[in-house]
């Protein structure tokens, strides 16, 4: 997601998904070590993490669980599950969750799924179009905590960055919704850094830039330079009064912020890019 290990999202978020999507989210990431000997799981996980490259400052789980050698078998299985889940990522989306960014990403993901699977009952992999708040929801180490006095949960997984980096390593496309909130998030900017550093040289990228972004900022200069060098697609979103996206029904939820919108043409262009 945009991604923040503490991803805020509105109550009954499952309402963003069809029944098929929701059931597959629940089943896609059940922790299992059936295809790897438990005696070798530490070595296997260590090799995979080494190949991904340790982030600046260390893996997120090191802050709460300790180094890889300190992890027990269940925790190692949790990492293995995250890696297995994100090996199938096709597209990955980076967004700032605040000020309507989360709702925009969820709407766009929903429309992208439906364009590829017009039949609501058509099966698909829940992690194909990766938003970490949703795609890691089935992992047993993902925890939800309701924030007091507001209709919002936060989601936390100690292995979120493992999944995100692995998603980038396998994805064919990566799209960024660039907003002031994205630029203000260290997690979002870290995702851009991971794209810059990935060994996946076949990944293509697109940047959807909203009109309230300071185009002359240092961060935007880095993005434009990257996009120019890698021939990324750059779209300037017009932020219309009405969205070209289909509204996603989120039952029993209040105060959703649909500030971030795309026109029909903008939505079609990005959908077409990710759907190739």
UniProtKB/Swiss-Prot annotation:
InterPro entries: Toll_tir_struct_dom_sf. One of its GO terms (molecular function) is hydrolase activity. Changing residue 210 to A: No longer toxic in N.tabacum, N.benthamiana or yeast, no change in plant subcellular location. It is an enzyme of class 3 (hydrolase). Residues 20-39 are annotated as: Disordered. Disruption phenotype: When both genes are deleted no 3'cADPR is detected in infiltrated A.thaliana, bacteria grow a bit less well in planta, when the genes are deleted individually reduced amounts of 3'cADPR are seen. When both genes are deleted pattern-triggered immunity is slower in infiltrated A.thaliana. GO terms for cellular component: host cell cytosol. Keywords: Host cytoplasm, Hydrolase, NAD, Plasmid, Virulence. Its EC number is 3.2.2.-. The keyword Hydrolase applies. Residues 20-38 have a biased composition (Polar residues). Identical genes are encoded on the chromosome (hopAM1-1, AAO54553.1) and on plasmid pDC3000A (hopAM1-2, AAO59032.1). This is 3' cyclic ADP-D-ribose synthase HopAM1. The gene is hopAM1-1.
């Amino acid at each position: 997601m945009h991604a923040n290990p503490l991803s805020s999202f509105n109550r009954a978020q499952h309402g963003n998904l069809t029944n098929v999507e929701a059931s597959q989210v629940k089943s896609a990431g059940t922790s299992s070590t059936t295809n790897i000997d438990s005696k070798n799981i530490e070595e296997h996980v260590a090799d995979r993490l080494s190949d991904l490259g340790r982030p600046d400052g260390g893996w997120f789980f090191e802050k709460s669980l300790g180094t890889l050698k300190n992890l027990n078998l269940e925790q190692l299985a949790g990492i293995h599950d995250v890696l297995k889940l994100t090996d199938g990522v096709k597209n990955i989306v980076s967004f700032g969750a605040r000020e309507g960014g989360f709702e925009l990403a969820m709407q766009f993901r929903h429309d992208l799924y439906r364009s590829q699977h017009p039949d609501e009952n058509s099966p698909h992999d829940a992690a194909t179009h990766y938003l970490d708040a949703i795609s890691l929801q089935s992992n047993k180490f993902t925890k939800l905590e309701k924030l007091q006095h507001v209709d919002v949960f936060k989601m936390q997984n100690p292995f979120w960055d493992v999944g995100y980096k692995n998603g980038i390593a396998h994805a064919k496309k990566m799209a960024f919704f660039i907003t002031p909130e994205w630029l203000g998030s260290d997690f979002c900017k870290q995702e851009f850094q991971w794209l810059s550093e990935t060994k996946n040289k076949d990944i293509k990228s697109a940047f959807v830039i909203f009109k309230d972004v300071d185009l002359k900022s240092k961060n935007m200069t880095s993005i434009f330079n990257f996009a120019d060098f890698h021939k990324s697609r750059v779209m300037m979103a017009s932020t219309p009064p009405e969205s070209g996206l289909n509204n996603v029904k989120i039952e029993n939820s209040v105060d959703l912020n649909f500030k971030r919108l795309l026109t029909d043409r903008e939505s079609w262009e990005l959908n077409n890019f990710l759907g190739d």
